[in-house]
Amino acid sequence: MNNKEITTLWCRLIIEELGRHGIHRFCISPGSRSTPLTAAAARNAGTRCTIFPDERAAAFFALGFARATGKPAVLICTSGTAVANYFPAVVEASFSNLPILVLSADRPFELFETGANQTIRQQGLFGTYSRWNIELPEPSEAIPAEALLSTIDYAVGRSLGSPPGPVHLNIPFREPFDPVNLSGPKPREASLTLWKQNNEPLNRFALSRKIADRAVVDRTKALLKNASSPLIVAGQLDSRTDAEAIGSLAETLDIPLYADISSQLRMNDTHAPLQPLLLSKRFTASFNPDLILHFGGKIVGKQLAITIKNRAPEHFIVINNSSRRYNPDHNVTLQIEAEPGEFAKLLVPEKSRSGKHERSLKALSDEIEKELDNYCASGKPLTEISTARILSGMIPESHGLFIANSMPIRDMDTYAALRKNGSAPLCAMNRGASGIDGNIATAAGLAQGLGTPVTLLIGDISFLHDLNSLTLLQGMEQPLHIVVVNNNGGGIFSFLPVATEKDIFETNFGTPQNYSIRAAAETFGISYNSPSSPESFKASYADLSRSAVSGIIEVNGSREENLAEHRRVNKQLRNIIDRHI
């Protein structure tokens, strides 16, 4: 076989083997060196290929797809800085335990360190953020096809392993590498007769669920039984099954539940949200849990962590399905590597406890909910707080909600509306490394993975940061409904001490952008609306949520008004809480 033939065969085997693992979504960025990989993916009948001129957007799209499905999408790119553009999403995927497969094309050995064009050191580029990386040899007849296939199998296994995450395969290609038609038996396929007949991967890696030791379960049960003031914290949970089990445990034991917005439990009306209560110093002064069971990943709000840090509980137990350390304040006493939902089920007692604790919190929570509903009523101004609350109450249960970092996720965490009978949508966000980049692309990937429309709540700076990802919206199978909260800058910095440094604040932190989001929508051919009241926002979003095409709703405000509104609303909530304590 000549070089073109063996290169074509290798790439076909790679794509075919990935498909046999159920991996069909390919995110391809155009390039010359990656031609054989692109051609193999495009010509495989089982693939679903999306083209991304921007590699950064491709990687964040793959991230969103993985969050929705638990499966990796495959990234294909050419050599040079192309692969480096994947880095931010690879970091997020690593910290969020989400699988991604990177196939980067590279130059042959003799071009390195010679000044050859578009040639950088790509092997190991992602460092400790990849679960595994390897540089394949150049395609060669001397290498058995089984070696190539089993390497692909291992890469898939590592990406889905414990914990899941990004895997990088760097593949050098020597010219000429343009694909050719192959016919007849190939020398190195002779031993693959069974593989060709059964449509199964050459080998699989069985994934086992993490089950806690019985002694650990019994010890945790004993601590729960003896605790006088226990608290359950639900951090980031991507599985609704896990969320339901943890919510059921809190309800059965009559234990207060701190449900983070990323837990899939925050909008459930069966539990009183603690985020608004922690705004009150009187409440935090009396809030002194002696046992904390923290299920899942990290949480958004700082106030709980501050309260716990000031009065550390005797026992602070973290249960998550990852061996990654979670102990930012160094007060965790026991970390258990287990499936959160399965572990929660093991803690459920035979008899339920009385609901006096939850009822007392529920009465206070109901008054807070009433106050926030009045704040969003007709005739009131449309603010960032009311936008988040109205949106949380209106989004269809069958849709997905992606919340961008900075102010949107904090507002949703604190002020989200409660919904009856667990009817909340799936909530997703990039909280692994909590960057503001790639949010539009991630939300687009989430929509395609879920197979449902997704609403994205995002600030103006994050929106502009990922503006080119609006190109994705034209060819999407599922629409993305974008709500942009535009306060002309980085609104979150107005809440920080640096805001008092008037000589440097506006230029260096406020960063007014003064760009037209309406013009951006027109440029990319996306429908646009800009409501100015709660009533018009509700009408605009109701129309958009029923639409089969993507659209943008812009909510305008100012950073000064936003700061004042947060202070005013939080003061009203504190007054309500303080009257009850």
UniProtKB/Swiss-Prot annotation:
Give me any GO biological process, just one. menaquinone biosynthetic process
Q: Which UniProt keywords apply?
A: Magnesium, Manganese, Menaquinone biosynthesis, Metal-binding, Thiamine pyrophosphate, Transferase
Its EC number(s): 2.2.1.9
Q: Which GO terms describe its molecular function?
A: 2-succinyl-5-enolpyruvyl-6-hydroxy-3-cyclohexene-1-carboxylic-acid synthase activity; magnesium ion binding; manganese ion binding; thiamine pyrophosphate binding
Q: Does the record's keyword annotation contain Manganese? A: yes
Q: Which reaction does it catalyse?
A: isochorismate + 2-oxoglutarate + H(+) = 5-enolpyruvoyl-6-hydroxy-2-succinyl-cyclohex-3-ene-1-carboxylate + CO2
EC category: transferase
Gene3D superfamilies for the chain: 3.40.50.970, TPP-binding domain (3.40.50.1220)
User: Has keyword Isomerase?
Assistant: no
Question: Which Pfam family, giving just one, matches this sequence?
Answer: TPP_enzyme_C
Which pathway, metabolic or otherwise, does it act in? Quinol/quinone metabolism; 1,4-dihydroxy-2-naphthoate biosynthesis; 1,4-dihydroxy-2-naphthoate from chorismate: step 2/7; Quinol/quinone metabolism; menaquinone biosynthesis
Which HAMAP family does its entry note?
Answer: MenD
Question: Subunit info?
Answer: Homodimer.
Family classification: Belongs to the TPP enzyme family. MenD subfamily.
Q: What is this protein called?
A: 2-succinyl-5-enolpyruvyl-6-hydroxy-3-cyclohexene-1-carboxylate synthase
Q: Which organism is it from?
A: Chlorobium phaeobacteroides (strain BS1)
